From Swiss-Prot:
The UniProt record lists the keyword ATP-binding: yes
Pathway assigned in UniProt: Carbohydrate degradation; glycolysis; pyruvate from D-glyceraldehyde 3-phosphate: step 2/5
Annotated organism of origin: Dictyostelium discoideum (Social amoeba)
Protein name per UniProt: Phosphoglycerate kinase
List of residues binding ATP: 218, 223, 242, 316, 347, 378-379
Main localization, broad class: cytoplasm
Amino acid sequence: MSSNKIGNKLSLDKVDVKGKRVLIRVDYNVPLDKNNNITSTQRIDASIPTLEYCLKNGAKSIVLMSHLGRPDGLVKPEYSLKPVVKVLEDQLKRPIKFLSDCVGEQVEKECANPEEGTVILLENLRFHIEEEGSGVDAEGKKVKANPEKVKEFRESLTKLGDVYVNDAFGTAHRAHSSMVGINLPQKAAGFLMKKELEYFAKALESPSKPFLAILGGAKVSDKIKLIENLLYKVDEMIIGGGMAFTFKKFIDNKEIGSSLFEKTAEQITKDIIAKAAKNNVKLHFPVDYVIADKFDNDANIKTVTQDQGIPEGWMGLDCGPETIKENRDTISRAKTIVWNGPMGVFEKSNFEAGTKAAMDDVVNATTNGAITIIGGGDTATCAAKYNTEDKVSHVSTGGGASLELLEGKELPGVTALSDL
């Protein structure tokens, strides 16, 4: 199994790049407005240390490949990576050569023997159906890629470098051509990927105890694999957000009014409770709620305890002050914390107290020496909103990828890297 242990993969700092053409899979899937201006450069910024390391250590060239959006294997100009060029030029203080394709004879020629220190950005990988293996045709019908053509696509990409570096953790759960199909002798994690793998290895392979998972979000069924896998690793688990109501209803038969509720999840919730008991994992649920008579910031709002229950026509949209206190105690005990999913509807100011308090408590735990990891997606959005990205140990850049890692799944993009 060792080849899939995430903590022992080759990383860029162990590779001699001097005089080499370095082919780097980055994640430049950046948000664009309708005038094709980039609205957040965060993903580009995050790749710069990897690129600067290669240039500083004498790489002959850097060839950057990425996807942007979902063009489904068709060339769609609105998904061009061209807008990235200006941002990269500003950051790296050098010209960037942009190629209008990512494979083929012309691209291979441009990348074969470039001048020392050249940085090349390829056009969107997903303009070719061979990147993802499926897409749509001009009529919008779903089509699968021809395996022979996929092989050619991968061979053409492989010709563009001497060393392969993967820095696209956000796509690591996809077995796409640029993630698993590059056939070079050294396949290393870039610094962004390395940081992700190091922190998840710390939590999943050698956590300091007590280990706490904080899990939120709407549906139990979406998080079932995550909960089940973590029940074999953690000492305590806080279950909050919308999915807490399904547990409250089935396990304690509490009145939950019109709160989020999954009718089909009865067996799942009972199995989780049983598994937690068997594994000596202490589960924490909300004991009070902030409720509203409609899903709106200007709704009528009140706080109720779980024993009072939530009246019909009202819904729980955040946890209450008692729960916040209990969560604070639980968080302050932990030495390793993984957090995936908000505690309430944090996007609306009247229902963000539970999430904001948990964030403050996780920041305090970090200050006191705990390793704290925030999974991607909504929880990463919370960290950005509350300006805490540099106040916790690690905020993951990959929503889907971090979720699959925490679920115990293998990530194809990680498995494909060279072992140490």
